[in-house]
Amino acid sequence: LASVTQFEANSSLKISDSRMGIILGKSIEPETNEKSKTTNFTLKNFQPISFANAVVSMTAESLVVDAPETAPVITLKLENGSVQPFLYNKDILVTPIAWRLQNDNDKFKMHKFALACVLDEIEAGATDLVFYLRHDKGADDKTDVYYSNWYGYDIKNALERFKEKAGNLPTKLVIKSHESGNNSNTEIPENYTEYTVEYKIASTNQ
């Protein structure tokens, strides 16, 4: 708590204003064979996670309007694939996103990322809830630099709508993204890259 107070005093960022974030810190293990009941942890940095509701579109045609896509992303996995989309709890999906952009703060703000599903694709008895990661680059047409960040999405409404149509909750979430890989190609590829996350309510935080 003391390190949080000190961090906020030296920063314009207030941690309690963020719904989600990544905490970077430092802990020193005591040099003893006895297990300590408490561990001191010093907060070094806090990175807020952008958070939004997942988009629920009726049709593939309405998806184009509800969640525009004007550019691919590089990937949704980091650290040589060891970090990929995951469930934070039963209603929140978190994913890393890497993309290319112009090295300019105003252009950075133009990039928007939406997670969307299409109701028309859900059939009775379905077990896979498919999401599309949509990247809108705005007016940024350059690919000078590589950037990655974390994004969180509230999927509660999508889960409820899925249950209405399928008659059950999904057992698997499938995230599809158009990816350019490490090249600087801005054209949206024809095929998707897919990521899967098992949806097990009992194994996630409530």
What is each of the regions a protein language model found here?
Residues 1-46:
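Start-of-domain marker
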Residues 77-144:
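Short helix-loop boundary/capping segments
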Residues 17-19, 137-180:
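Short, solvent-exposed, Trp/other aromatic-anchored flexible loops in extracytoplasmic proteins
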Residues 14-17, 87-91, 125, 167-169:
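Solvent-exposed loop and beta-edge segments used for protein-protein assembly and interaction
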Residues 32-42, 143-145, 163, 183-192:
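Beta-sandwich strand segments
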Residues 31-98:
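Surface-exposed beta-loop interaction hotspot
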Residues 181-206:
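Short beta-strand elements
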Residues 21-23, 95, 131, 151, ...:
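Hydrophobic residues positioned within well-ordered beta-strands of beta-sheet architectures
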